[in-house]
Each structure stands twice: as C-alpha cells, then as structure tokens.
Design a protein with these regions (language model features):
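Non-globular, low-confidence helical/coil segments that flank catalytic cores
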Residues: 1-190
C-alpha cells in the first residue's frame, strides 16, 4: 500500500527485487499526498501493474497527474473506489474501504485497508483523521494483529476508541526522528 516519496523509488525497487517481484498485481494508494504517491508513476513505468486502486476524489497534484499519465501510457486501469472492494487470494484477502463522502481533505479521504492472511489481520489506516476514523469504526473487525497508525502516529479520540475496540497486538507508525508519538497513544497501546 502506497508508494512513498519520489526519492524513495530506488529503495522500493530494491525491496521488490530482493523478493523477486516482477509484477505488481494491485498498486493500492490510500490517498494522493506526495508522501504516499510520490513514486507511483515511476513504479507503473518500471513494472507491469495489474490495477491501480485509490479513493475517488480529485487532487490538484503534479504527482497524481504524472500517475494518471503513466497509467494511460501503460494501459493500466486506475479504479477510483466509491464502495468497498475486496480481493481474495489463496491464503487471504484484502478489503479497501473508501470514504462515504469527499471530506475535502486528503487525509480524511484515505482508503482504509484490511488485510487478512490466514488467521492474521492487519489494518492500514492511510492518513485517516477524526472524520474518517469515526466513519470506519462500525466497519472495523473485532481485533487486528497489527494496526498501521494513521498520519505519523497523530492521536485523536476516534483512533483511541478504535484501538480500545480492536485491541491490536502490534502498532506501527512512520515518524521522522524529530517526531514523537503522544503519550496517550502509547498508553492506549500498552
């Protein structure tokens, strides 16, 4: 899920090559901020991609324009989701839950992704903020093995409620060395 910043392309390709990946079946983009789609156009040009999946809202962004152009050049379908989309595999599935409305805010327009692999479930929240998290609470599973925290680990009441409701065993956040995760979020995860 997601394609990081433009300058992360080489690292992404190196990771894919180490795993022997030669094709990307589904390129899932939680939303269209540059730190989530910066390398997406380059990935579409570098690898055969079966489908690009993202939320259905427009963003005036050079990166989204480049992605649309690359998808068109490579004849790669770009599905803009307005309802849940599930893909089943031999050992599991993933479900993409788009926002019910356009919140007018990239982060609140994030797709929420639930991945189930065998008996283990993961929740990837994009950069969802209060409105989007409140919307998702009713759809959440009873528990997740791992939650990828939204928006650099920013804490808010709906996120704390989601953690209490789903009791994840692990949580992951992408933060820079200058950022700290709030104490109340750490306490909720303990």
């Amino acid at each position: 899920t997601d394609a990081a910043d433009e300058d992360d392309f080489d690292s992404i390709c190196a990771a894919l090559e180490r795993r022997g990946v030669q094709r990307i079946d589904y390129l899932v983009l939680s939303h269209y901020d540059k730190d989530h789609i910066g390398s997406a156009a380059a990935l579409v040009r570098a690898y055969p991609v079966g489908q690009i999946l993202g939320p259905d809202y427009e963003e005036d962004s050079m990166y989204l324009t480049l992605l649309k152009r690359a998808a068109e050049e490579r004849n790669t379908p770009f599905l803009r989701l307005t309802e849940n989309y599930t893909v089943k595999t031999e050992n599991g599935s993933f479900t993409l839950d788009p926002p019910d409305i356009d919140y007018g805010d990239d982060n609140n327009n994030s797709l929420v992704t639930t991945v189930t692999w065998r008996e283990t479930s993961f929740l990837l929240l994009g950069d969802a903020k209060k409105n989007r998290l409140n919307e998702f609470l009713d759809a959440a599973l009873d528990s997740y093995e791992l939650i990828k925290l939204p928006h650099h680990g920013d804490s808010n009441k709906p996120l704390l409620k989601l953690i209490a409701q789903t009791t994840p065993r692990y949580a992951a956040a992408t933060v820079s060395p200058a950022e700290e995760i709030e104490d109340k979020l750490i306490a909720a995860l303990a």
